[in-house]
From Swiss-Prot:
Function noted in UniProt: Involved in the biosynthesis of the compatible solute mannosylglucosylglycerate through a phosphorylating pathway. Catalyzes the conversion of glucosyl-3-phosphoglycerate (GPG) to mannosylglucosyl-3-phosphoglycerate (MGPG).
Keywords: Glycosyltransferase, Transferase
GO MF terms, alphabetically ordered: glycosyltransferase activity
Protein name: Mannosylglucosyl-3-phosphoglycerate synthase
Assembly with partners or alone: Monomer in solution.
Organism: Petrotoga mobilis (strain DSM 10674 / SJ95)
């Protein structure tokens, strides 16, 4: 039985840990699997699979996050050397090495040590990309480029780049990674029906419970569920304003923030929900976690105004729970080839005065000047800024949070024109909340563990066949290490969408 070595900074509960659990479940009978990561950072996201017979965890403290301000070049080199020595201790030429988010800028010493290790040893390797630092994570980007000037994407026969969505798969190929070195591996999702029988739940009873908890909900309204944590990229104030303009629904948001960085945004969202003008309930599960299945049951629509997602979980959740959904149109929609047009909206427009537009543009100019990229690349962003702000109607998600809140608190008479401007959104909400579960083009089987397992074996066959091939055999891949790939990836993210003022609040 061959070894599979999996690397990530930590295994805290979250997206990457879910993926790792699914990898382990799919391969536990075919490989001896060892998970490497920082125990100190957390491993609660993988505890479930550590009981399997062929699965081990090895504490690798050096893989934990490091930080820009506390890492000088000497520290970087010492840490890199320590990581390389450990990797050499676990060198197995028959093993497959699988690293997650090695490019993210959370530990540049690991990034460079791992890259040098797999290229010099010619090890069959999967580098799975969940996120890019160039996508709204400029601190990470600056950190990784503080120490690494070479390409993060070496092209070798032994290296496969796996992405969790089709958009990023196409991005890699457009940016210069050969298709034979790229693999599309969408996440698997496992759902379990609630064991408690709740079909006969009385909607009025649930609404009364919410009222007793202090929420401003109307029992005659429809219920729009936004199942999310209160984090900036979820763009929750947009959902608040859309709900307010629709005027016939309660907006139900499930969770508060989960990190200190999100607390200022959480405070604004909390204050907005406390207004009498807003019908709904915020952070329900923090007040009473037992209510969630009942909230789910009485919901008439799943909704998301999120502006950044790596995976379309909400589409699968809504399908599983037999609920209709409406979301912002994001790149992850490409993963759902049959999704219906009624399922999403492109933008939510609000009217700004020329003075307000200039103020917002000034804030973006300040933002652009802070980003650690060339002046030429900054000019790409300035051009995009001018294009997106050349009319008096601006996408709500581009506004600073303070201005978003102001719109949410505005007198109703001043908001009426927004209903007509965004009529298509409200027509969709009306239809989706007035009909029972309709076919919106989502197939759960495409994202089942069974489908995932078959894709993983295709990926492993590919990396083993190409990695073990003699030079000059197995396709046309040349050994390339060219920063033009990195530059192209950077340019692919140079839009105002990725430096929204929302992200830096």
């Amino acid at each position: 039985m061959n070894n599979l070595y999996i690397f990530h900074y930590h295994y805290i509960k979250g997206g990457v840990s879910t993926v790792v659990r699914n990898i382990v479940k799919s391969l536990k009978d075919a490989y001896k699997i060892t998970l490497f990561g920082s125990k100190k950072m957390g491993i609660d996201g993988i505890e479930e699979v550590l009981s399997y017979e062929n699965v081990d965890f090895i504490d690798f403290p050096e893989l934990g996050y490091i930080y820009y301000d506390s890492t000088d070049y000497k520290t970087f080199l010492e840490l890199k050397e320590s990581i390389k020595n450990k990797l050499n201790n676990y060198h197995d030429e028959r093993a497959i090495y699988w690293a997650h988010n090695y490019n993210l800028g959370k530990n540049p010493a690991f990034t460079e040590a791992f890259k040098e290790f797999i290229t010099t040893k010619n090890i069959p390797t999967i580098i799975q990309i969940h996120d890019f630092p160039e996508c709204a994570r400029w601190e990470n980007y600056s950190f990784i480029r503080k120490f690494i000037n070479s390409s993060l994407y070496p092209i070798r026969k032994n290296i496969q780049y796996a992405t969790i969505n089709l958009s990023d798969y196409n991005r890699l190929i457009k940016c210069g990674i050969p298709s034979e070195n790229a693999f599309y591996l969408p996440n698997a999702v496992e759902f379990a029906k609630n064991k408690d029988k709740i079909d006969d739940i009385d909607k009025d009873e649930v609404i009364n419970k919410l009222k007793k908890l202090g929420y401003n909900v109307d029992p005659t309204n429809k219920n729009i569920l936004y199942p999310t944590r209160t984090i900036r990229r979820k763009n929750i104030l947009e959902a608040v304003l859309i709900n307010r303009l629709y005027g016939k629904s309660n907006l139900l948001v499930t969770l508060p923030a989960n990190s200190d960085k999100e607390r200022p945004y959480e405070k604004v969202v909390k204050e907005t929900f406390e207004s009498e003008k807003v019908k709904g309930a915020w952070a329900i599960s923090a007040k009473d976690p037992s209510l969630f299945p009942y909230i789910l049951n009485i919901s008439d629509l799943f909704f998301s105004s999120s502006v950044l997602e790596g995976f379309g979980m909400i589409y699968l959740e809504s399908k599983f729970n037999e609920k209709n959904f409406l979301t912002r149109k994001l790149d992850v929609i490409e993963d759902f080839k049959n999704i219906k047009e009624i399922s999403y909206y492109d933008r939510f427009l609000v009217s700004l005065s020329p003075k307000e537009i200039n103020k917002v543009k000034e804030k973006y100019e300040e933002q652009i000047n802070k980003i650690p990229i060339s002046e030429e690349n900054k000019n790409h962003l300035r051009q995009d800024l001018n294009n997106k702000f050349d009319k008096d109607l601006i996408d709500f998600s581009f506004l600073p949070v303070e201005l978003q809140k102001k719109f949410c608190m505005e007198e109703e008479a001043k908001l009426n024109d927004l209903k007509e401007i965004n009529k298509e959104i409200f027509d969709k909400i009306e239809m989706l909340t007035s009909t029972n579960h309709i076919d919106q083009g989502i197939n759960l089987e495409d994202f089942s563990l069974k489908a995932y397992k078959s894709k993983i074996f295709l990926l492993l066959d590919k990396v083993q066949a190409r990695g073990n091939a003699p030079k000059g055999v197995q396709g046309s891949t040349k050994e390339i290490e060219d920063t033009i790939i990195d530059e192209n990836i950077l340019k692919s993210f140079l839009t105002i969408d990725n430096i929204r003022l929302l992200f830096s609040y």
